[in-house]
Amino acid sequence: IARRYATERWIGGYDLLNEPVLFNGGSQVRNLQRRMRNRIRKYDLNHTLFVNGNMWSRAFEGMGPALDQNMIWAFHYYSWMVFNRVNQSTIQYLINFRNLTNRPLWLGEAGENSNEWFMEVTNLMEKNDIGWAWWNYKKIGTITGPVSSPSDSVYQQITKYWNGDGARPTTEIAQLGLNNMVENLKLEHCE
């Protein structure tokens, strides 16, 4: 990937490993991500590396020092991770880590609760000079994102089956439902 995209200006960077979970600590995650960095840097010195913490991108013990001068510590912030509280104490350890390693922070995912919750999270991030992105930008039939695509009854048959609440759809129904979902995800059909 790095060899192919090294000179592409429209590439923002590489998210090395999304939500790693190694119960023996961050040093194992760090070692794996260091090997990934070394491979990428053989071909690409231009693009930023997004380095996620351990335990679903929340724990940074054993992750320092910084792996690269052109890197950002990436973390996730979901309500279950912070007991549905949005306040300074839930991110202070990240700010301390940022200051210790002299590398910026990036909130790569924040969980779908409510628009009010999102507002509190983005305000907290901006108050602390932390970059952030919507996760997820586009969802099916919800208000917890900037863009919502419509759902339809055929696609809902599939999701009911996946959730154990409905009969297994035929191959034809499954294909039609997934095709409908893809069509509905086009921006011209979204709210």
Predicted regions and their residues:
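Extended, alpha-helix-rich binding/interface surfaces that flank or overlap catalytic cores
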Residues: 123-124, 128-191
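Extracellular glycoside hydrolase catalytic/binding regions
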Residues: 3-130, 134, 144-156
